[in-house]
Design a protein with these regions (language model features):
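Extracytosolic ligand-binding ectodomains
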Residues: 2-5, 33-413
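Hydrophobic alpha-helical segments, especially transmembrane helices
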Residues: 13-15, 19, 160, 309
C-alpha cells in the first residue's frame, strides 16, 4: 500500500469512527480490508495467562477480552486483509510453565504477545521477550517491577493495567483522608506480594506513616487468625491486603470470626470472585483501586459489556478489569501495526509503532491518544483510577463523584 493511499484510508477511518461506538480500530479494519483484497498469511499474536487453576477467574476474562477484540477485527477483514490468529498458552499461574510457554511462543514466531496475570510468572519470562525483541503487552498483572526491569527506551515490555506503584498511593491517600492511619499490611510471599508490600510502605512513608504490623504468608494458607490477632494488638484500624487469590477472603473471614470490625482495603484483587464470593458478607465494605467497573456508564462501555455477555454467554464478567484491559490491549496493538508505513512487522518496528503517536483510539478503559512513548511503557495513569467498594456481593463505585466522572472516559495525564 502506498503512503498516500494509507493516509487516505486513515482519514476516511477517522471520519467513520466518529459514528461507530464500537471504537476506532474496528473501523480501521473495515476500510483497510477494502484496500487489500489479495489473501495474505495470517498474523499470529501470542496470548499467555492462567486459563485454568486458581488464577483463572481473572485469566479467562483477560483471554476473552482479547478474543472478543480479535474476532471483531477479523469480522471486518482483519488487519489489511490478514486474519489475526491467537496462539494461546495456559501458564497455570506457574512461573516455570510460563517461561517454557513463552519460549514456545518465540519458536512459533508470533509477532507480539499479550498476557500475564501473575507478576511472578511474568517476571520470569520477561527476558524471553526482551532478548528476542518481541513486544509484550501486559493487560492484567500489576506488579511494578514488570515495566521497570529494563531501561524504558530499550524495553519491549508494555502494559495496559494499572501498576501497583500508582494503585498503592491511590488507596493509601484515601484511607488517610478517612482517618485510618494505623495500617496493618498482609502480603503474600509471591512476586506480587513482595512488590506490593514495598509500594504500600513507600506510599505510607510519603504520608509520614509506617505500618503498625506486617504479616507475610504463602499462597494456600487457610488460617491467618494469629496474624490478625497480632495486628489488632498492634492497634491497626485498617488492613491493607496484597494477594491475588482466596487468601484475601481468608483475611476477611478471619476478621469477622474475631469480631474485629476494621475495614479491608487493597489493590484490584479485592474485586475478584475469590474475595467477593469467597468472603461473602465479610467482604462487604472492602475498598479497592479500579480502572473499570462493570456499569454501562457510557455508550462505549455498554456496548462492550453487552457484546461480551452475548459472546461468552455470561450474566456478568468475573473480573471486568481484566477483560476490558485485554480488549483495549488488542486494539492498541492492531492500531500500532496500522501505523507502520512500510509493512515491516519485525519486532523493533512494532515496538517503535507502539511508542509513536498515532490516531486516537477510543477504548473501553480509557481514550488512548498516545498510550506509550519511548520513555513510558505504562498506558494507565493515576487519574484513570476510581475507588471500588464491595456491596451486597458486587463491586460498585465507592463515591458518587467517581460514578459521575466515569460518564466520561479518561485520558492519560
Amino acid at each position: 500500500m502506498q503512503i498516500d493511499e494509507r493516509d487516505n484510508v486513515l482519514q476516511r477511518v477517522r471520519l467513520f469512527a466518529r459514528s461507530v461506538t464500537l471504537g476506532f480500530v474496528t473501523s480501521v479494519s473495515v476500510v483497510c480490508a477494502q484496500a487489500q483484497t489479495t489473501p495474505e498469511p495470517t498474523l499470529k499474536i501470542g496470548v499467555i495467562g492462567p486459563f485454568t487453576g486458581p488464577s483463572a477467574d481473572f485469566g479467562v476474562p483477560m483471554l476473552n477480552g482479547i478474543q472478543q477484540a480479535a474476532d471483531e477485527i477479523n469480522a471486518f477483514g482483519g488487519y489489511l486483509g490478514r486474519k489475526i490468529v491467537l496462539v494461546k498458552k495456559d501458564d497455570q499461574a506457574n512461573p516455570d510453565v510460563g517461561l517454557k510457554l513463552s519460549q514456545e511462543l518465540v519458536a512459533e514466531k508470533v509477532l507480539a504477545t499479550i498476557g500475564f496475570c501473575n507478576t511472578g510468572v511474568g517476571l520470569k519470562s520477561l527476558d524471553t521477550f526482551q532478548t528476542n525483541k518481541i513486544p509484550l503487552i501486559i493487560p492484567c498483572a500489576t506488579g511494578s517491577p514488570l515495566t521497570a526491569k529494563y531501561p524504558a527506551i530499550e524495553s519491549y515490555i508494555f502494559r495496559t493495567s494499572a501498576r501497583d506503584v500508582i494503585q498503592a498511593p491511590f488507596v493509601v491517600n484515601d484511607i488517610v483522608k478517612r482517618g485510618w492511619d494505623k495500617v496493618a499490611i498482609f502480603a503474600d510471599s509471591t512476586g506480587y506480594g513482595e512488590a506490593g508490600l514495598k509500594d504500600v510502605e513507600t506510599a505510607l512513608t510519603a504520608q509520614k506513616l509506617k505500618p503498625v504490623y506486617v504479616a507475610r504468608f504463602k499462597l494456600g494458607v487457610t488460617d491467618l487468625s494469629e496474624e490478625l490477632k497480632a495486628a489488632r494488638e498492634a492497634g491497626a484500624n485498617v488492613v491493607f491486603s496484597y494477594t491475588v487469590g482466596p487468601e484475601n477472603a481468608v483475611i476477611a473471614r478471619g476478621r469477622q470470626a474475631l469480631g474485629w470490625k476494621v475495614p479491608q482495603v487493597g489493590g484490584w484483587p479485592l474485586s475478584f470472585p475469590s474475595f467477593v464470593e469467597g468472603g461473602k458478607d465479610a467482604a462487604d465494605g472492602a475498598l479497592m483501586a479500579q480502572t473499570f467497573i462493570a456499569e454501562p456508564s457510557n455508550e462505549r462501555r455498554a456496548s462492550f459489556l453487552t457484546s461480551y455477555a452475548r459472546k461468552f454467554n455470561v450474566k456478568k464478567i468475573p473480573v471486568p478489569m481484566a477483560a476490558a484491559q485485554g480488549y483495549d490491549a488488542m486494539y492498541i496493538l492492531v492500531y500500532a501495526l496500522l501505523g507502520i508505513r512500510d509493512n515491516n512487522l519485525a519486532g523493533p518496528a512494532i515496538k517503535a509503532a507502539l511508542e509513536s503517536k498515532n490516531k486516537t483510539y477510543y477504548g473501553v478503559v480509557a481514550t488512548y491518544e498516545q498510550p506509550f512513548t519511548r520513555e513510558d511503557k505504562d498506558a494507565i495513569t493515576a487519574n484513570m483510577l476510581v475507588m471500588g467498594v464491595v456491596k451486597n456481593g458486587a463491586v460498585s463505585f465507592a463515591y458518587p463523584e467517581d460514578a459521575k466522572r466515569n460518564l466520561f472516559v479518561q485520558r492519560k495525564q
